[in-house]
């Protein structure tokens, strides 16, 4: 089965940008860099800022890499799919959410719903908190303490239906 381009995960550890998932590039086996990825890989500013602020001068003590999920409003449709976290977990990499302010309740919902997510970095976390979370993650501990409001199941289902194009009238009926 051919995967959609949006499900492909590439490494951001070096300029080669090797494919990590679903089909790993051969050169990944010989790479000495830790595997880090941002998914979906469409926000160049997030990618550059994340690499420079949180990944440089860090050492991952774990044998598997990390997928940092761009949990922002432009990607909302992806996160109403019940299988997105399971699909990324098939890569064997740790999943960490990078949540913007508007999707914090949905990110908190997924932290509670999925045991595949190792942590969450909020947009308003200060530098010290971000560094502490990265240290916890890179030493094999969780950084999944949630903060703020959380969607409940009913709110999630309503959001999913709105995103799929169902009107309020259709939902009520």
Describe the predicted segments one by one:
Residues 1-141:
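N-terminal regulatory/sensing modules of transcriptional regulators
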Residues 144-173:
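Helix-turn-helix DNA-binding segment
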């Amino acid at each position: 089965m051919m995967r959609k381009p949006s499900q492909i995960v590439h490494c951001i550890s070096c300029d080669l940008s090797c494919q990590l998932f679903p089909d790993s590039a051969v050169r990944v086996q010989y790479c000495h860099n830790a595997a880090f990825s941002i998914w979906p890989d469409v926000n160049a500013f997030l990618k550059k800022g994340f690499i420079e602020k949180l990944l440089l001068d860090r050492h991952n003590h774990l044998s598997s890499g990390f997928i940092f999920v761009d949990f922002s409003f432009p990607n909302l449709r992806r996160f109403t799919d019940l299988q997105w976290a399971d699909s990324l977990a098939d890569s064997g990499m740790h999943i960490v959410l990078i949540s913007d302010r508007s999707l914090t309740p949905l990110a908190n919902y997924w932290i509670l719903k999925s045991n595949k997510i190792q942590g969450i970095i909020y947009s308003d976390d200060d530098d010290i908190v971000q560094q502490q979370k990265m240290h916890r993650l890179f030493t094999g501990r969780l950084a999944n303490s949630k903060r703020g409001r959380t969607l409940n199941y009913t709110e999630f289902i309503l959001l999913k239906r709105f995103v799929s194009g169902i009107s309020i009238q259709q939902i009520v009926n």
